[in-house]
Curated annotation (Swiss-Prot):
The keyword DNA-binding does not apply. It comes from Rickettsia akari (strain Hartford). Catalyzes the conversion of heme O to heme A by two successive hydroxylations of the methyl group at C8. The first hydroxylation forms heme I, the second hydroxylation results in an unstable dihydroxymethyl group, which spontaneously dehydrates, resulting in the formyl group of heme A. GO terms for cellular component: plasma membrane. It is found in: Cell membrane. Heme binds at residues 256, 316. This is Heme A synthase.
Length: 337
């Protein structure tokens, strides 16, 4: 009963975090992220209802750079569309925190979760608090002189969400999954190492993907596998090792492409390691990994070739989380055997 309660709670929390990541990505891709120019964690829980309140929100938006530089002449109806998308993103964030923290308090005082097991849940709670601040810190960067958010703040905002998901998902499978029964003579060192490496490179790739989104780097060099006619674009070829490149969309797209090759290579090696063990559950994970990897790569290529269609780009982001989840599951099973 205790495990069942925790499992259901963690499952819902994981789904909510995934929804937050996907809707956050859509908010970024549609340019809706700067439509709400205030941070009101408590009083901002309700949207405008009257015509006058909508006009007031629109007037606030007009006072900031994005309206004058990007959306000048936007109608109130058009403003409502981007406002409501950002509002849903923020509302979902509040709901996610409530869905996480209320049961956590209950479980703690009812001794459903033991004191010795509380650390990861407390870390996740602290990260939720940091995430709320980071979201506003990111938005604030686009309300100053430039009508675009800092791509670094955007990337950290995403990575914090992924770390929260990682913690919750690991606790979920820890409560839900049985330990693998593998003969003691079976060598699991190599798949354990490569699953750890795979998790690391996917984290890096997710971070780079956020930089690509923040710089609109997916809207240039819409060709594959070459960037135009070159493997290394001419803009960065003669000045590759320069910190200024971290603000260059061409360089960031190039590094993200390299990251995708790294993910492909590491995951394929991991799949081979899992298949050589000849264990039914690990073999099943290997097949899931290949499907998720192929989906992730194909949606990434389509996103690039067609200049970032929102639906495909969102699916691409979702499969990054799915791929990471499968590898976390794999790592847990091997590490616990």
């Amino acid at each position: 009963m205790r495990k069942s309660l925790i499992t259901k709670w963690l499952f819902v929390s994981c789904i909510m975090v995934i929804a937050m990541v996907v809707i956050g990505g859509i908010t970024r891709l549609t340019g809706a992220g700067l439509s709400i120019v205030e941070w009101r964690p408590v009083t901002g829980i309700l949207p405008p209802f009257s015509f006058e309140s909508w006009q007031a929100e629109f007037a606030k938006y007009k006072a900031f750079p994005e309206y004058n530089s990007v959306n000048y002449g936007m109608t109130l109806s058009e403003f409502k569309c981007i406002y409501l998308l950002e509002f849903i993103h923020r509302l979902l964030g509040r709901m996610t925190v409530l869905i996480y923290i209320v049961p956590l308090i209950y479980f703690y005082f009812k001794d459903v979760i033991k004191n010795c097991d509380m650390l990861p849940y407390i870390i996740a709670l602290l990260l939720f608090c940091v995430q709320g601040f980071m979201g506003w810190y990111m938005v604030k960067s686009g309300l100053l002189n430039s009508p675009s958010v800092s791509h670094f703040r955007l990337a950290f905002h995403l990575i914090i969400a992924v770390i929260i998901y990682h913690i919750l998902f690991y606790q979920l499978i820890k409560n839900r999954c049985d330990i693998l029964l593998i003969p003691s003579q079976t060598d699991l060192k190599l798949p354990l190492i490569f699953s750890g490496i795979a998790i690391t490179v996917i984290y890096v790739q997710i971070f780079l993907g956020a930089l690509v989104a923040g710089l609109d780097a997916g809207l240039i060099y819409n060709s594959f596998p070459l960037m135009g006619d070159h493997c290394i674009p001419m803009e960065i070829k003669d000045n590759f090792f320069n910190l200024a490149n971290l603000h260059d969309p061409v360089f960031i797209q190039f590094i993200h492409r390299l990251g995708s090759y790294s993910v492909f290579l590491v995951v394929v090696v991991l799949v081979i390691c899992l298949l050589t063990i000849e264990h039914p559950k690990l073999n099943k994970i290997a097949y899931f990994l290949m499907i998720a990897l192929l989906m992730q790569i194909s949606t990434g290529i389509i996103t690039l070739l067609y200049s970032v269609p929102i639906i495909i780009a969102s699916i691409h982001q979702l499969f990054a989380i799915i791929l990471l989840s499968i590898i976390i599951w794999c790592y847990f099973l091997i590490n616990s055997s």
